[in-house]
Amino acid sequence: MDNLAIFEEFNSKKISQDDLEATIISLNNYFVKLNDLNNQYLNLIRQDNIDKSKKQNIKIQRKNTKIEINKIIATTKLFKQNIKLAESMYKKIKSSNNQDDIKKAQLEVDNAKSMLIQFKEAINGQGKSIKLKKLNDVAIEIKNLSFKYGPEFPNAIDDVSFTINQGEYVTIIGHNGSGKSTISKILIGVLNAQQGEIRIFGNIVHDHNIEQARKFLGIVFQNPDNQFIGSTVEADIAFGLENKRVDPKKMPDIILDSAKKVGMEWALKKEPLNLSGGQKQRVAIASTLALDPDIMIFDEATSMLDPKGKREIKEIMVQLRETRTKTILSITHDMDEILNADKVIVLDHGKLVRVAKPLDIVEDKEFLRNIQLDVPFVGLVREELEKKGIKIASTQNIDELVEQICKK
C-alpha cells in the first residue's frame, strides 16, 4: 500500500477536530442543563411548601442528565484509540523514508494526542474549554430574560424575549431606566441574569463559556474618552489585536484597513485626545472593527456627540448595515437613529412592549408619547403639515421628506 492510500485509510477512520468540538459542545450543554437543574432543586427545597411531584421530576431529569454526561466521558477511550490509530499509520509511513510524508504523519500523531488532552480538559472544566462555533444564523436569541440589581429592587429586565438574525440592524429604544443598557451589559457578561437564556449563534451563554462568547461581540460605548488606552490612534487600534495575539506582521494592514473604514487613516499617528468627539468615536469603532466581531453593539454611541459627530457615526452604522457582514445592535434613545434599522425593539420599565419596523413605530405617535419617547423630527414635521391640511406619505428620513414636500 502506498503512502497516499495509507493516509486515505487513516483519514476515513480518525477522529477529526470537528468531531472533538461537536463532542465538547454536547458535553458543555449537558453540564449547563445539570447546573440549571441543581439550581432549580436548591430553590425548590428552600420553599416552605415543597411540590413533591416537581421535586421528583427534577431529580429524574438530573439523573438522566448525569447519565448522558457519563456516556460522553466514556468516549475518552475512543480518543485513546485514535492515538493508537495515528501511531500505527506513522509506523507504516516511516518505513517509506519519505521525509515530507513522515512529517505529515507525525503531525497527525501530535494532533491525536492534543485532542485527548483537550477532551480531558473539557471534562475537568465542564466543557468550558470549547471554542464556540456558529451553530445557526440567529446572532442573538434571548428567552425569558429577567434581571434585578438587588432583592429590594424591581426587575430592570422583566421576562424579555427576542431574536436578532445574522446581518440585521436592530435598535433597542426606551426611556431612561427602561432596561436598554442593562441588556447590553448582560450580553457582554458584565451582569448575570437571574432568569432566562441567551444564545449567541445557537450557543447557550453561561459562566463557563462567556469568554468564548465575547469573541463574537464588539461594543462601542457612550463616552469615547473612556475607551482609549494607546498614546496614538494606531496604538489604540493595535491594543485589542495584541490581546487577541494577532500576528504582529499582519497588524499594520488590519489597522490601516479598519481606520479606512471609518475615514480615520489620516489620524493614525495622532493622539486620540486631540480629536473631536465624533472622531474619537470613529476610532473606537475602528478598534472594534479590527477585531472582526460578528456582532457590533453600539450602546448609546452617539448620545454625547454634537450634531456633526452624531451624523458621522450614523453614516458609518448605515455603511456597516449595507454590507450585511455584521449584525448591528444599536441601543439608543435617539429616535431619528431608529429610521436606519431593519426592526425596532421597544422596552418600557424593563418589559418588551413592541417589536416592529421603524416606520410603524414612528407613525404611532400616541404610543411613543405614552412611553415617554420623542417623536422623530420627520414625524413631527409631517404632523404639523397634516394639521395645515398637507398630507405627506410616510418617509424614512429627512431627504425623503423634503422630496415629498417639493412635490406638493
From Swiss-Prot:
EC number: 7.-.-.-
GO molecular function ontology, one term from the record: ATP hydrolysis activity
Compartment(s) where it occurs, according to its Swiss-Prot or TrEMBL record: Cell membrane
Xref: Pfam families: ABC_tran (PF00005)
Binding site for ATP: G174, H175, N176, G177, S178, G179, K180, S181
Domain ABC transporter: 140-374
GO cellular component: ATP-binding cassette (ABC) transporter complex
Top-rank taxon, per record: Bacteria
Topology within the bilayer: Peripheral membrane protein
Keywords recorded for this protein, A-Z: ATP-binding, Cell membrane, Membrane, Nucleotide-binding, Translocase, Transport
Annotated InterPro entries: AAA+_ATPase (IPR003593), ABC_transporter-like_ATP-bd (IPR003439), ABC_transporter-like_CS (IPR017871), ABC_transpr_CbiO/EcfA_su (IPR015856), ECF_ABC_transporter_ATP-bd (IPR050095), EcfA_1 (IPR030947), P-loop_NTPase (IPR027417)
Similarity comment: Belongs to the ABC transporter superfamily. Energy-coupling factor EcfA family.
Binding partners and assembly: Forms a stable energy-coupling factor (ECF) transporter complex composed of 2 membrane-embedded substrate-binding proteins (S component), 2 ATP-binding proteins (A component) and 2 transmembrane proteins (T component).
Function (record text): ATP-binding (A) component of a common energy-coupling factor (ECF) ABC-transporter complex. Unlike classic ABC transporters this ECF transporter provides the energy necessary to transport a number of different substrates.
Name of this protein: Energy-coupling factor transporter ATP-binding protein EcfA1
Source organism of the structure: Mycoplasma capricolum subsp. capricolum (strain California kid / ATCC 27343 / NCTC 10154)
Gene this protein is translated from: ecfA1
